[in-house]
Amino acid sequence: MLIEGIFAAITTPFYPDERVYYRKLEANVARYSRSLLSGLIVLGSTGEAAELDDTETREVFRVAADAAAAEKVLVAGIGRESVRATIALAEAAAEARYDAVLVRTPTYYAPSMTPQAVATYYRSVADRSPLPVILYNIPRFVPYKIPVEMVAELAHHPNIIGIKDSSGDFNNLTALIATTQNAPRRTVTVTPVFEAVTARMLKPTAAQPDQATFVAASDLAGGTAVAAAPPAPALKTRTREVGFQVLTGSAAITLAALEAGAAGAILGFAACAPQACQEIYFAWKDHDQKLAADKQQRILAASQRIVNELGINGVKYACDFNGYYGGYARRPLLPLVASQKQEIESLLANIRN
């Protein structure tokens, strides 16, 4: 699976009583689908995955997949505390026609999470996951930083295709890129313009019986006939060779990561400002270094303050301010105070997406 470009790590809207607000989730995903984002991360850290039970998680997967445009790559956050529970969610994501899964390291038994235990966890999940696995390194929330050497070894697993590095450490990112250069290259299916082909793009689209239409007798030699709509033309595809795909989870180093060889970025800031994040990527692809640097500088202060310092409620209020459904996070995360909301409005004054 090709995981390339800018991905939004989207939020999960809630009612005031903290039930999941599925209609607002649906509306958000539909709007993201009209953007130029490569895809969406559903129930990553920004989506408050740790706050949802398994029933809610499965329904969020389904609702988001049904609302997403077929060409958007969908990645499901499925990290749980056991191999068994993680695989169960991987299967649920596959049933909802996701394209890959994002897997964090277990945290509850942190003292027991030795390198051997962590590597065994990831290999065991990858062995049985019906979807490709993306490793998730986020030492800010998970008290375990996946060693570069371990990633280099796991990169040889046929079902582990990449890593999201949210350490914010550029040196760590470049080390990941360098040490996975020798990982086996994989053949992926892409469109004629080398963009990802998703599971939902490959979904059969042949006409169903209830799609038949009546043709008036006056238009025929005699009688009334039923004409079924023809099946949609087959999707044209080609193949492309890709290596182990390293993506940054830090908006502040998006441009530097791309220049260093990263495949893209998975950003919580893209949930509230997708266009601003995309503009960095497209300027870089167009080899306009000055414009790319300007676009990177434009989001620097806002992304740092909103995502890294104000956290989930900061991102959610920024979503509200920019026309998405944000709302409040589930407790124990505390809501923002008025001065913090005003600060976000000031930071986003010139980043209206």
Show which residues each predicted segment covers:
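Active-site beta->alpha loop and helix N-cap motifs at the rims of alpha/beta catalytic domains
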Residues: 1-145
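A non-catalytic, amphipathic alpha-helix used as a structural packing/dimerization or gating element
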Residues: 23-27, 31, 59, 63, ...
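Generic alpha-helical structural context detector
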Residues: 8, 282, 316-320
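C-terminal extensions of enzymes
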Residues: 306, 310-353
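Catalytic alpha/beta core domains of metabolic enzymes, predominantly
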Residues: 124-127, 139-298, 304
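Acidic-histidine catalytic/liganding microenvironments
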Residues: 71, 157-158, 309
